[in-house]
């Protein structure tokens, strides 16, 4: 019972932070899930937790969705998520996490800690290939952190619109991933309970997090998002420190 309460409390805190930071709640759960269930359980457990939490977030932010972005991003995310989850049991993704971590850290320099609104101009169709890649990587490791935030910031989508739009894209993707994990035998009853516990805790945080977000200035939001991206990158690289040490 203690483990389930710890997962629920961690989910609650992680999703408040991730809402204010533009996503990446599952990333904060990775160390705990890896400790209680093992590294191989991280992807299916965090996917279920994200799915449960995102259902509440989708309701809370339902009026803030940029549907033009969803039209491009959702197909890519669903296809990528399916392919990544299918390859989950037979693919090693350690170096991918290190590369993504370095990219996330670099955003601090790109945006000058939120002082710059954009670093490059984008077109909406970019969301399809970007979500295809991120969906695939998410299927492999379960949590990619706020990787897509760079694209959203450059599209001028911030605060509630970023959270609402990202949720509308990620919710179906995580449904596809969870179904694939279950079909391939990567999700069992115990892992389901772990994911559900973290997800229920996260679900309760959505309303409180939205109140914080409403009162935040756009520039402050950008600065927090960028700092959280860098922190997520550090966490990803730290999680693969054994791989780096072994290589050198």
Q: Which residues are covered by each model-predicted region?
A:
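Residues within membrane-spanning alpha-helices of integral membrane proteins
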Residues: 4, 47, 100-104, 108, ...
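Small-residue-rich hydrophobic segments that form or flank transmembrane alpha-helices
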Residues: 4-72, 130-135, 143-206
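Membrane-interface helix termini and inter-helical loops of multi-pass transporters
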Residues: 30, 85-94, 119, 181-193, ...
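Transmembrane helix exit motif
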Residues: 54-64, 85, 99-123, 207-211, ...
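Membrane-interface helix-boundary motifs at transmembrane edges
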Residues: 63-68, 115-122, 155-160, 213-220
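Loop-to-transmembrane alpha-helix entry segments
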Residues: 67-72, 90-104, 215, 219-223, ...
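Transmembrane alpha-helices of Major Facilitator/SLC transporters
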Residues: 78-84, 199-209
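Interfacial loop-to-transmembrane junctions
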Residues: 206-230
